[in-house]
Amino acid sequence: IEHIMDKITLHDGDLSDSSSLIRIINIVQPDEIYNLAAQSHVQVSFDVPEYSGDVDALGVLRILEACRILGLTKKTKVYQASTSELYGKVEEVPQRETTPFHPYSPYAVAKQYGFWIVKEYREAYNMFCCSGILFNHESERRGENFVTRKITLAAGRIAEGIQDHLELGNMDSLRDWGYAKDYVECMWMIMQHETPEDFVIATGEQHTVRDFTEKAFAANGITIRWEGTGLEEKGYDAETGKMLVCVNPEWFRPTDVDNLWGDPTKAKTVLGWNPQKTTYAELVEIMAKHDRQLAKQEKAMKAAL
């Protein structure tokens, strides 16, 4: 955010500390609050379930309650970044606003509380607060511990000869991946709508981890040839025959959600949002090109040592 530091003011706060939230909201008197803060990694939530619950569930409550205590229920709108992980072991495909929730991780359970407490404050206090049920949103800024970024980083580094291979978990997991920049536009549109409502934010397309991997390598000029199934599946460079991708059971989650596919019809019809502004293929290309440049820089730095 260095390029916009002259346009913003940063305040120190923490979703686990209600006093800091009350202080900041009282100082700023905001028209809109976008709560994008969370412990947002599903796998990590199994390692730190209490922390995930404190931040992802009670953190939402603390923001809403701060607005209520400060008398801002009529002034301040609140957007809560919810998640497709709420659907968990899905009960219908694709998933829409009316699909029942079946959370399947500590992260998803905490996020479900966040979703329902937003709805409760909306109805109990007539607040303009709403949730966007975000399906996987990716970009070149995605954390390196998330699978899409792990893939594009590895593809770039392998293409530059500074990484040997890539290890992944469930190659058959199905996800609805969109570009974060487009999804933020939808968040803003939700907050400009005349009434507070909850919306699914998704592309309406579904792809496997395998397909994302294949396209990321293709963006780096490498064609992957797949052999084997399950834990024995491997991806080889079609030109050289070198093994570049393999499955490691350590990357499987204790409980895995394997079929997420969002239906953005409501956001399209009610808000006029375009979920295909950036296509899936363009998203992978953007991330792959960015991380190839990082790999080139890393290679140059190593050569200079």
Question: Regions from the language model: what does each represent?
Answer:
Residues 1-137, 181, 187, 191, ...:
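N-terminal Rossmann-like NAD(P)+-binding domain of SDR-like oxidoreductases, especially those catalyzing
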Residues 13-16, 142-305:
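C-terminal substrate-binding subdomain of Rossmann-fold SDR/epimerase-dehydratase oxidoreductases
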